[in-house]
């Protein structure tokens, strides 16, 4: 909620900055009462620097005044740095409610916390914040939807930079059953898939690896299904799934394997790293998909859900953050903006998030 309010504030203060520059220019031409310079600068300093600068250029106003010519661009740079710093260090919790008649009454109010795209826990502060916010949600299940490691950093450190990440996994598994699927960055773990020290450490910490697998969660004699898929880009090393040449057919093969033997009349939750494959998931009896990978589109507008760029979706991606419904209407998907960064180590109006989903009947 704070982030939405802040987004609208930034939009409105910049509209005000633009309007005041235009209005003051009009008053100057009319030789009428002028808007005090301290007011114009105060609006820029309060977050309206972009609108003020745009107004200066369009209305050709104050462009020769040093305090405006230099001051307003500096204020704009300062605000950009502050917003990017906040989007790097702060973490928000996004809460969603999902309803389904397939959910047994005993599971009504079942809470899932999703953590995605951590790309290695990088500081004690991040570790503490994630843990504190997860505990606050009191989850019944924790879903780690890929890219728990960061491939470039893992390679450079030979896997020695994962201590805090493994420790966090142990803490999470102590809060609620925790399930982990591979994203594309887990490709680095596949050179020795069974004996990789990170994989072994995470499983020993109590997290269940759910790649191309499913589990049935039982409560008072009723059940729901949790199914995990690994990222299709890394299936070329799988002796069975490597025969498929495209992501769609690989995901279909994974779903065939993972859902086999399940009672799909039960509510079925799927963990999969790739949001752009929503309509493929919807070809199967899948009720809810939790996904990530898009990093929120990296750079976002202050309000709305439009991101700039995402892997495997390109520019102006469709699936970046929040809830989506498949074309056939049968499957809902929630996409996390993630908690870390990798190749593009910056965010803008794109705060890292923990996702908390309450499933209601």
List each language-model region with its residue ranges.
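Binuclear metal-dependent hydrolase catalytic cores centered on His/Asp/Glu-rich metal-binding motifs
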Residues: 196, 200, 204-207, 219-268, ...
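Active-site metal-binding loops of divalent metal-dependent hydrolases
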Residues: 115-119, 146-148, 184-186, 213-214, ...
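Acidic, histidine-bearing metal-coordination/catalytic regions of metal-dependent phosphoesterases
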Residues: 78-111
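Lipid-exposed faces of alpha-helical membrane segments in multi-pass integral membrane proteins
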Residues: 8-19, 43, 74-78
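Membrane-embedded segments
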Residues: 89, 106-210
């Amino acid at each position: 909620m704070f982030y939405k309010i802040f987004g609208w504030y930034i939009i409105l203060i910049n509209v005000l900055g633009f309007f005041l520059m235009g209005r003051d220019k009009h008053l100057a031409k009319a030789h009428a009462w002028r808007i005090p310079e301290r007011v114009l600068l105060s609006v820029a300093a309060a977050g309206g620097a972009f609108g003020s600068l745009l107004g200066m250029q369009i209305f050709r106003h104050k462009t020769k005044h040093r305090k405006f010519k230099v001051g307003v661009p500096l204020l704009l740079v300062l605000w950009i740095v502050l917003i990017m710093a906040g989007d790097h260090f702060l973490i928000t919790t996004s809460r969603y409610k999902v309803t389904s008649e397939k959910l047994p009454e005993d599971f009504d109010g079942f809470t899932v916390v999703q953590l995605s795209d951590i790309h290695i826990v990088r500081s004690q502060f991040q570790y503490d914040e994630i843990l504190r916010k997860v505990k606050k949600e009191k989850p019944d299940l924790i879903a780690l939807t890929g890219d728990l490691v960061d491939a470039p950093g893992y390679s450079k450190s030979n896997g020695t930079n994962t201590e805090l990440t493994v420790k966090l996994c142990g803490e999470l598994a102590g809060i609620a059953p925790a399930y982990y699927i591979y994203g594309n960055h887990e490709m680095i773990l596949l050179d020795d898939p069974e004996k990789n020290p990170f994989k072994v450490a995470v499983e020993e910490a109590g997290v269940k690896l759910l790649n191309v697998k499913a589990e049935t969660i039982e409560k008072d004699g009723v059940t729901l299904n949790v199914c995990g898929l690994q990222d299709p880009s890394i299936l070329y090393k799988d002796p069975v799934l490597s025969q498929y040449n495209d992501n769609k057919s690989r995901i279909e093969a994974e779903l065939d394997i993972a859902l086999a033997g399940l009672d799909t009349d039960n509510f079925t939750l799927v963990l999969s790293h790739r949001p752009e494959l929503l309509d493929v998931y919807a070809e199967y009896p899948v009720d809810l998909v939790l996904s990530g990978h898009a990093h929120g589109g990296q750079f976002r507008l202050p309000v709305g859900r439009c991101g700039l760029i995402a892997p495997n979706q390109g520019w102006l991606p469709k699936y970046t953050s929040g809830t989506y419904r498949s074309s056939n209407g049968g499957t809902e998907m929630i996409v996390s903006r993630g908690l870390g960064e990798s190749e593009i180590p910056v965010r803008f109006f794109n705060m890292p998030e923990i996702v908390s989903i309450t499933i209601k009947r």
